[in-house]
């Protein structure tokens, strides 16, 4: 296993390779958090993910771990360092089966809105391995586009949940930062 450095919430503002996305989801924070806990949902709305395996038993909490199989054969071993259902969660890579990054973390925040909707904030920060540091700035537009597609996939997935658990207002445009 290629070990990765743990990151903290402060690293999202410190690292150059950091992205922020915001959108409105047509479901309550509770329902969206259920989607995040459901390992079967991830490959549907995040096409780059082939499989999610929780390696810690429920109830999930800080310290919970999971393995995520990603297209291209990458397996990421993740540890959650924030777990506050239904409001926020964050994890960092403990390691990967391939030398992909030195460190990577993701932060998910769910803010309740009127009409049973949710403001979703997703932040991703990473440090490239030394040989990729010079190429990383050139890849930023492609990474941003790739991540925006994941957000759009989540919007579609949530919008198609059973009507009793979603709001009926139209989806909002994704805003990407970073």
Annotated model-derived regions:
Residues 54-58, 94-96:
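Short, solvent-exposed loop/turn elements at beta->coil junctions and helix N-caps
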Residues 2-4, 43-44, 70-119, 125, ...:
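Hydrophobic-ligand binding "helix-grip"
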Residues 22-26, 53, 69, 79, ...:
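Generic structural detector for well-ordered beta-strands
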Residues 1-56, 175-178:
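Hydrophobic ligand-binding cavity/cleft-lining segments
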